[in-house]
Amino acid sequence: MPNFIDYTKYYGEKSFEEVPFNDIDALILAELSYLNFSDVSDELPNTIENISKSYFYVVTKEKIKSKKNVYKYAHNLFGYVKTSPRFKDIEMINYSRIVDSKKQFGAITFKYNDWIYISYEGTNEYMSGWREDFDLSNTFPVPSQKLAAEYLIGEAKKHNKIYVGGHSKGGNLAVAAAMQADEKVRKKIITVYDFDGPGVREKEFNSDQFQTLIPKIKKFTPEVSVIGMILYSTPNYTVVKSDYKGILQHHAMSWQCFGSYFIPAKQSKSSIKFNKSIKDFLKDNTEEELRNFVKAIFEVLQKSDITSTETVTIKKIIKCVNYVRQLNTYDPKTKDKLLKLFNIVLALYTNK
């Protein structure tokens, strides 16, 4: 079935004046934020077409072979949009990339005529980004969310029509940035695009900052959603048909579209069950308990060689369960919670 690559072929000849900016355009620009433009950032601002020449000279097919699928997909996508009349003249400006032991942050702004799209990068291969994803359950804002807000506020000083968006953690950063912005900046935001990103804690969900933002949030998840079902998000989300199975549906490359629209679908029963289980699971814990619990999860994942959604397999989840069972370093309460959590994930992965 057609995906966003097919969209670039069908609509690549159409200008934004002929076919207005839409949800699939937003996903395409969100996916491009996964690419590392550090080696060509001194050429910004510049058009997609011009930057692509330098980018593909530096980042060869050989270099991308060892990368995770999300980078390969984005690399392939960039190859399609670089000469597309619809995308090639979009300006790329203000590339930011910060990675250290405590945070992972990436953002780039795309500008076309009088509007901009701020694209936040999702979780990459660095462990600091993976760790931040877990910290969302006990902290707000995490370091990357603070950086996302600063980035948005900086761009809002220069532009008046703003879209913000991202895939996975990038979707969460888009929402978090808008939440932290003042009313003057919020008025400039047209839409906040959240493509299967984790939500926020119940405390932030119930805040005025989030509730008043809901009308501007457009969230999309696949039928089987794990990342996008974590914590609390806008209740008005769209489920998209995917041609991948299980947790791999998180890859937006698998999301099906028809024309300039995503093909709608129904949330899987396993995703609904997972969402409820995680919320129930988090309710009865203090912030300190959650911090310690996240630390324990992270240790188990590392011991089981799980560093991203792409490295998750049934064998590795079972390895997590067995590892926890054999441990004597955690108190009984933490050990019990770890077992419940990994069994929930195992049930989701096996669609039981």
Provide a role label for each language-model segment.
Residues 174-183:
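Short glycine-enriched nucleophile-adjacent loop
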Residues 166-170, 174:
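Gly/Ala-rich beta-loop-alpha elbow adjacent to hydrolase catalytic centers
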